[in-house]
């Protein structure tokens, strides 16, 4: 298949620039693969469409304030986006500067703090902080809003560009399907008899990398670190053995589960994955998916197409556009069953 097979015309005013006042005020478009029927609801109603014994798998990765601003000794401006923390003081980062940096260069931050460039690694730079990097980011870092949100980060983003169940720091972009869940929705889901388990996948900046190849099969996915625990494997196997559904909350949770089952059986693991899911892929674990509405020609639209069918995906997205759903990270959600 070609990249343009996944193109759709999205009016710019449908790209959500801010979150709604309340997380669960988001709209919810539900699609059933068996009946090919869909319906329009509010996200707070989602428990009504889940069944006792269903297992929701959520990504508990926490967004870090990964964007830093500084300057070189010459005064030239430098912008960093932390891609991955590799140690207490070391990290890999994308760096924007008027002139490329080299080993041993220093980057000066506010409050008298500084970073040292250790070496270049492909498109990234290995750097060392003057203190614990997470502490430094919490002091000086900015929330790394996606490129399609055309504004600077604000104080509200520290709370709202984060799931209420985020626990493991490491993502530079939110697992956005989880942004709609608030405590009331989680309580209603548990009261329904639905089980919840967690995976961890640290979302990298590569999630926004466009597909440049005409043939989608030629696209090389970015790599991200994920962990599937023994407890999660046990929960998934228990649900499957009872004939219950495993529903991934977000494409990151789905990609983690499918990566851990590449050998045919879900096994505990903690490693990198660059799994690319597009039409023709045979799903091994996931029976349902909760996900936002994604960019045209993106790998995430290709994943949704693999899950519900290409024509069905394009029709569903056109329905969302016609009904004025809000798109992308701060937008509305879909439940695909």
Curated annotation (Swiss-Prot):
Cytoplasm listed as a keyword: yes
Matching SUPFAM superfamilies: QueA-like
Assigned GO CC terms: cytoplasm
Reactions the enzyme catalyzes: 7-aminomethyl-7-carbaguanosine(34) in tRNA + S-adenosyl-L-methionine = epoxyqueuosine(34) in tRNA + adenine + L-methionine + 2 H(+)
UniProt KW ATP-binding keyword: no
Location, primary (coarse class): cytoplasm
Keywords (A to Z) from UniProt: Cytoplasm, Queuosine biosynthesis, S-adenosyl-L-methionine, Transferase
UniProt GO BP: queuosine biosynthetic process; tRNA wobble guanine modification
One Pfam family here: Queuosine_synth
Compartment annotation: Cytoplasm
Single annotated GO MF: S-adenosylmethionine:tRNA ribosyltransferase-isomerase activity
InterPro entries linked: QueA (IPR003699), QueA_dom1 (IPR042118), QueA_dom2 (IPR042119), QueA_sf (IPR036100)
Pathway of action: tRNA modification; tRNA-queuosine biosynthesis
EC number(s) recorded for this UniProt protein: 2.4.99.17
Domain of life: Bacteria
HAMAP family reported in the protein's UniProt record: QueA (MF_00113)
Similarity section: Belongs to the QueA family.
Quaternary assembly: Monomer.
Function: Transfers and isomerizes the ribose moiety from AdoMet to the 7-aminomethyl group of 7-deazaguanine (preQ1-tRNA) to give epoxyqueuosine (oQ-tRNA).
Protein name: S-adenosylmethionine:tRNA ribosyltransferase-isomerase
Organism: Legionella pneumophila subsp. pneumophila (strain Philadelphia 1 / ATCC 33152 / DSM 7513)
């Amino acid at each position: 298949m070609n990249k343009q097979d996944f193109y759709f015309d999205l009016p710019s005013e449908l790209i959500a620039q801010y979150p709604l006042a309340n997380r669960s005020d988001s709209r919810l478009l539900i699609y059933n693969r068996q009946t090919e029927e869909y319906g329009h609801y509010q996200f707070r109603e989602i428990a009504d469409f889940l069944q006792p014994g269903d297992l929701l798998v959520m990504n508990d990765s926490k967004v870090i304030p990964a964007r830093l601003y500084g300057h070189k000794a010459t005064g030239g401006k430098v912008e960093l986006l932390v891609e991955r923390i590799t140690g207490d003081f070391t990290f890999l980062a994308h760096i924007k500067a008027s002139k490329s940096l080299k080993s041993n260069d220093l980057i000066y931050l506010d409050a008298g703090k500084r970073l040292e460039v250790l070496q270049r690694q492909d498109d990234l730079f290995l750097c060392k902080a003057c203190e614990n990097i997470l502490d430094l980011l919490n002091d000086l870092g900015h929330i790394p809003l996606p490129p399609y949100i055309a504004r600077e980060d604000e104080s509200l983003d520290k709370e709202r560009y984060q799931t209420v169940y985020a626990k493991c720091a490491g993502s530079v972009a939110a697992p956005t399907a989880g942004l709609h869940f608030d405590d009331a929705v989680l309580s209603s889901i548990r009261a329904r008899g639905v089980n919840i388990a967690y995976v961890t996948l640290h979302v990298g900046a590569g999630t926004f990398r466009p597909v440049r190849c005409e043939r989608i099969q030629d696209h090389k996915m970015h790599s991200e670190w994920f962990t599937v625990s023994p407890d999660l494997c046990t929960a998934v196997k228990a649900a499957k053995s009872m004939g219950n559904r495993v529903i991934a909350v977000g494409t990151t949770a789905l990609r983690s589960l499918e990566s851990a089952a590449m050998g045919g059986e879900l096994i505990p693991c903690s490693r990198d994955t660059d799994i690319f899911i597009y039409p023709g892929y045979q799903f091994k674990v996931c029976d349902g998916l909760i996900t936002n509405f994604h960019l045209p020609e993106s790998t995430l639209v290709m994943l949704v197409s693999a899950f519900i069918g290409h024509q069905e995906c394009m029709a569903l997205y056109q329905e969302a556009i016609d009904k004025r759903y809000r798109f992308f990270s701060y937008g509305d959600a879909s439940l695909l069953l």
